[in-house]
């Protein structure tokens, strides 16, 4: 991912920011959390890795998760810590995971809960309760 450059010849940043504003502008916690994401998405990052790392870092901060991000080039033993790298498969259905079952929370559209939309949906809709919702969503082995 460090080699993947971002094409700034397209206006993808403005399109994404307008899309987020359009979808979540009326969410209860939009005005509080959006200013954290806007400058990151407006900045011209040198590569996809830098953009993703900044977004991950701000999400963890907003979720009050003081997690140290360790970059590993190769898989290695990490002791007693839970290693889910092999469990996260982009093409697999997220709702089939043995370690996670989304806990319903109030959303903007419709009456039915739509799980696994995005961390933005969770933050904009429930604000400071987001960490609690995620903890409740973890399945215990």
Where does each model-flagged region fall?
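Residues lining hydrophobic/aromatic ligand-binding pockets adjacent to catalytic sites
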Residues: 1-141
């Amino acid at each position: 991912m460090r080699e993947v450059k971002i094409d700034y010849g397209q206006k993808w940043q403005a399109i994404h920011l307008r899309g987020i504003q359009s979808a979540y502008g009326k969410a209860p916690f939009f005005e509080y959390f959006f200013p954290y994401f806007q400058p990151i998405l407006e900045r011209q990052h040198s590569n996809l890795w830098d953009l993703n790392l900044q977004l991950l870092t701000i999400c963890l901060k907003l979720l009050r998760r003081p997690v140290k991000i360790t970059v590993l080039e190769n898989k290695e033993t990490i002791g007693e810590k839970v290693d889910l790298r092999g469990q996260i498969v982009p093409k697999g259905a997220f709702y089939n995971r043995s370690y996670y079952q989304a806990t319903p929370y109030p959303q903007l559209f419709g009456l039915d809960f739509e799980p696994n939309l995005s961390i933005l949906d969770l933050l904009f809709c429930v604000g400071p309760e987001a960490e609690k919702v995620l903890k409740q969503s973890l399945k215990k082995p």
